Amino acid sequence: MTNFEYYRDFDDFQRRETINFFLSKFPLASQKQLQDFLEQARQAYVQLRQTNPAHLDWNQTLLYLAQKFLPEKQSEKDRLKKILVLQEQLKVRYEGEIKRQSQQNSELLIQLGQRDEEIIQMQQLFKEKERQLEVYQKQLNEAKEYNHKLEEHYNKTLEEALKEYEQQCTDAIHRRDEEIQAIFTSKLNEKNSEITQLQTYLQSAVDENEALQKQHKLVLFKNQKYEKMVSDLQVDLARIQEINNSLTSEKRDFQRANNDLVKQYNKLKNRLEQKLGEITNAQVNGQTHTVSLADTSQQFHRPQEAVIPQTQVISYTLDDMDDDMEVEETPPTTNKDLPRGATQPKRNSIKRVSKLID
């Protein structure tokens, strides 16, 4: 873009290059700011073309124009700072939520640790009962051995007494075994029920921990989704702001054009009313002048001009003027379709009526 001889006007190529340069410098600028920068670049280009700079770089001119937009860039920085502040607030909020969830998880882990300690205590108690049972079993074996020795010692002389005593000892041992077995079975069932209940508590705690982990993942997913929604909303708000700015400028241009049209209409209406008054007042003088022209028409051999009747002049009212301003008549294709001596009317009705009045 250093050679200005290739480009006589500020065409689409310079426009695209200028837009790319501006967006690279100010990526978050509005549509109005871009239009202002393009207008300044076009004016600068025209001035440079007039001075005919043979060795001037167009990029330097763009950089000089971009320096004038530093306040706009500062406003973009403020806007980015506000966005960062909002992001920090959301970050603090979600960090607090995550800390609260972590605290709840820690409490649940503490409860699980307490349950584990209770299970360990029950296991130790169960082992102690097993040791007691082994002691009882050892005592039983010793008693059996002692009975066996007595049986051998008194086999010959006290056979009947030993048989009776053995039966009594056997019955006593059997009853004692049954009692021990019943006590052990009841205790074992109690411990098994306690262990089952503790396992149920442990499983429920594990399920709650998994549910909390799922909720934690869901919170993280919602956080990412919310951040994405915030970024999309920011993009949509920027687009809406651009559309609103363009609509505001279009509305302002339309109101200005409408006001100009109303002023032109009122001006034309006043002029027409003034001319109609002048024509109406001049009808009497016009008739007298027509008679004098008729007396002298034979001497100069000039055709007499037709006088516009008063009824014909008055019939052209303001409503007809409005119709002329609003509806544009389609002229005939050729002059043959027109009456003799008439010409095709002009297309601009407002200019035609103003010329007729003048």
Curated annotation (Swiss-Prot):
Superkingdom field: Bacteria
UniProt biased composition (Basic residues): 348-358
Location of the region described as Disordered in the Swiss-Prot/TrEMBL record: 324-358
Entry protein name: Uncharacterized protein MG269 homolog
Origin species: Mycoplasma pneumoniae (strain ATCC 29342 / M129 / Subtype 1) (Mycoplasmoides pneumoniae)
